[in-house]
């Protein structure tokens, strides 16, 4: 099949597509005009001529008929130009032509043929439409045949070359003549040849098979020579010569038919497969393909191919690459070092919003806690005191200051007593941990505890408390150094935080509990009054604040 004629010529009928066909208002061609038979086509001529005659007429008909060759065979004139007279007496003469008929599969000494009968109506219709019809053939009625006849023709192959009408094919009636399926059925046992017909005369073969009639002159392997080679007076020796010539041409046709594009591609593919890999002694195949690194096409790097053999592949001739000079390599290295040393410039965060407030939770500053604690303005002075750079601060190293003081108002008598404690130091510490109470008491000054005492009260976190007790004749003053405490005085409750001060009057019940998450520290001072203090409530004490005034 010629694929270059797709859409131009019918594959099966051989009808050419009409180019100048009138179209209707919808730009559509008339289907009758589109498939109208071309009178000048070779297939239509052969079809019409084939329908007019059965190709093999009897030697004698019923008295009034005459042996006349079909019109399409009258062109083959014999060399002896033998004149045949009509029995009717009209004097119409015709030259008898020799018909070359050779069967492709077998030869018999005497070829006996029985004419194929056709219906009179169909024959008459075909005769009316045929331009080659003769008056004699038009008068023929339905023939009745009395005997069979045989024909023999000599074939001279020495002078002119033979002309091949149709390609070789198997004349087996069981062969499926239509286009085979691409996938054969499993239950199809009667399949001999499922290959597509790709010969040059496939169109003509399909036409002849569709008509259901295969003329003897068009059987596969028949050849027709020029007019000069036809000889009606040939004997059996000429038949044998023609058979030998036919076999030689048949072998040549088989070679030409098989030598198609598919076979050529298969041969080339086998050559490529055998050379594209190396098989070692273990049977492993190693590819010989050339591996090329990715090319920089922007630098005009490319692979140049060239055909070095008859194989259907191209071989690599050369690979064009770009080589950087030493100066360029040094420049690139310097640029890399510069990028590494360059500090990143401060830029806006990826979540920057024009409102000025970034999205999401801000990052925690590790130095935030240190900034919350205010710096001690006396830090430098404390360092100088601890180092001994300032006078009157040496006792802090010992923790307790004991000095000589007066002990009487009337007498000039002095005595050494403890008058100061360093931070986190006390004279004694008492801890009480029971079911109802949990606290610690640091006593600092208690030499005259029947009148006066002072110290620090500590309440542990969560569970620290001092149960409800009576103050009797003692006044107690507390200053909260750390934490949060809940104070109960008589029937009153209140909270005290860091830096606050509260007092417990005499003759009242009081209780203290820790309500914070850390330890609570309170400095206290207590003073005990005499028993007759209630009698002197109305008297004025002139010396109460004389020491601060």
UniProtKB/Swiss-Prot annotation:
- Chief localisation class: nucleus
Location within or outside the cell: Nucleus; Chromosome, Centromere; Chromosome, Centromere, Kinetochore
Tell me which CDD domains the record gives.
cupin_CENP-C_C (cd06993)
Q: What keywords are annotated for this sequence in UniProt?
A: Cell cycle, Cell division, Centromere, Chromosome, DNA-binding, Kinetochore, Mitosis, Nucleus, Phosphoprotein, Repeat
Q: Listed GO molecular functions?
A: centromeric DNA binding; protein-containing complex binding
Map out region (Disordered) in residue numbers. 47-275, 335-374
Q: Which residues lie in Low complexity bias regions?
A: 226-237
Enumerate the Gene Ontology biological process terms.
attachment of mitotic spindle microtubules to kinetochore; cell division; chromosome segregation; kinetochore assembly; mitotic spindle organization; spindle attachment to meiosis I kinetochore
Q: Which InterPro entries match?
A: CENP-C/Mif2/cnp3 (IPR028386), Mif2/CENP-C_cupin (IPR025974), Mif2_N (IPR028929), RmlC-like_jellyroll (IPR014710)
Q: Where is the composition biased (Basic residues)?
A: 335-345
The annotated regions of Acidic residues compositional bias extend over 114-124, 203-225, 238-262
Q: Name one Pfam family in it.
A: Mif2_N
> Which intervals carry biased composition (Polar residues)?
56-65, 96-108, 151-163
Residue ranges with Basic and acidic residues bias: 263-275
**Where along the sequence lies the DNA-binding region?**
356-364
Please provide one cellular component term from the Gene Ontology annotations of this protein.
Answer: nucleus
Q: Which residues carry this modification: Phosphoserine?
A: 325
Q: What else is known?
A: Present with 465 molecules/cell in log phase SD medium.
How does the record describe its quaternary structure? Component of the inner kinetochore constitutive centromere-associated network (CCAN) (also known as central kinetochore CTF19 complex in yeast), which is composed of at least AME1, CHL4, CNN1, CTF3, CTF19, IML3, MCM16, MCM21, MCM22, MHF1, MHF2, MIF2, NKP1, NKP2, OKP1 and WIP1. Interacts with CBF1.
Which family, according to UniProt?
A: Belongs to the CENP-C/MIF2 family.
Q: What does this protein do?
A: Component of the kinetochore, a multiprotein complex that assembles on centromeric DNA and attaches chromosomes to spindle microtubules, mediating chromosome segregation and sister chromatid segregation during meiosis and mitosis. Component of the inner kinetochore constitutive centromere-associated network (CCAN), which serves as a structural platform for outer kinetochore assembly.
What is the protein name given in its UniProt record? Inner kinetochore subunit MIF2
């Amino acid at each position: 099949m010629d694929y270059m004629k797709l859409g131009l010529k019918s594959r099966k009928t051989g009808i050419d597509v009409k180019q100048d066909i009138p179209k209707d208002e919808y730009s559509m061609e008339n289907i009758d005009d589109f498939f109208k038979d071309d009178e000048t086509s070779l297939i239509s001529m052969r079809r019409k001529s084939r329908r007019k005659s059965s190709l093999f007429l009897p030697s004698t008909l019923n008295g009034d008929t005459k042996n006349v060759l079909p019109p399409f065979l009258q062109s083959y004139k014999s060399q002896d130009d033998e004149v045949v007279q009509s029995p009717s007496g009209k004097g119409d003469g015709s030259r008898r032509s020799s018909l070359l008929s050779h069967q492709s599969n077998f030869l018999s000494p005497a070829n006996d043929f029985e004419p194929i009968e056709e219906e009179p109506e169909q024959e008459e219709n075909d005769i009316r439409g045929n331009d080659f019809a003769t008056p004699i053939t038009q008068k023929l009625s339905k023939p009745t045949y009395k005997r069979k006849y045989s024909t023999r023709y000599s074939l001279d192959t020495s002078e002119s070359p033979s002309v091949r009408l149709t390609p070789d094919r198997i004349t087996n009636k069981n062969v499926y003549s239509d286009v085979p399926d691409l996938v054969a059925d499993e239950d199809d046992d009667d399949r001999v040849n499922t290959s597509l017909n790709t010969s040059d005369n496939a169109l003509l073969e399909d036409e002849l098979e569709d008509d259901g009639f295969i003329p003897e002159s068009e059987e596969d392997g028949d050849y027709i020579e020029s007019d000069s080679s036809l000889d009606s007076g040939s004997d059996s020796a000429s038949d044998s010569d023609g058979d030998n010539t036919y076999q030689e041409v048949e072998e040549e046709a088989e070679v030409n038919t098989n030598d198609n594009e598919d076979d050529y591609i298969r041969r080339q593919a086998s050559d490529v497969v055998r050379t594209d890999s190396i098989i070692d002694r273990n049977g492993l195949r190693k590819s010989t393909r050339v591996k090329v690194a990715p090319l920089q096409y922007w630098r005009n790097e490319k692979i140049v191919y060239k055909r070095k053999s008859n194989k259907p592949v191209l071989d690599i001739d050369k690979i064009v690459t770009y080589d950087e000079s030493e100066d360029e390599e040094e420049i690139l290295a310097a640029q890399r070092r510069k990028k590494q040393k360059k500090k990143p410039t401060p830029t806006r965060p990826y979540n920057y919003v024009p409102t000025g407030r970034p999205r999401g939770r801000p990052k925690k500053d590790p130095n935030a806690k240190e900034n919350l604690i205010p710096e001690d303005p006396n830090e430098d002075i404390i360092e100088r005191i601890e180092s001994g750079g300032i006078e009157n601060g040496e006792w802090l190293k010992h923790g307790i200051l004991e000095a000589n003081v007066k002990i009487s108002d009337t007498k000039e008598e002095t005595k050494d007593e403890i008058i100061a404690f360093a931070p986190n130091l006390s004279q004694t510490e008492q801890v009480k941990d029971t079911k109802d109470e949990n606290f610690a008491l640091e006593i600092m000054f208690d030499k005259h505890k029947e009148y006066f005492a002072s110290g620090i009260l500590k309440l542990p976190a969560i569970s620290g408390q001092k149960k409800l007790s009576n103050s009797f004749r003692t006044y107690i003053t507390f200053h909260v150094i750390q934490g949060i405490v809940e104070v109960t005085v008589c029937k009153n409750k209140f909270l005290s935080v860091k830096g606050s001060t509260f007092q417990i009057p005499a003759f009242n019940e009081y209780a203290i509990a820790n309500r914070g998450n850390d330890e609570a520290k309170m400095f206290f001072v207590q003073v005990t009054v005499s028993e007759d203090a209630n009698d002197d409530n109305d008297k004025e004490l002139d010396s109460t604040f004389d020491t601060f005034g």
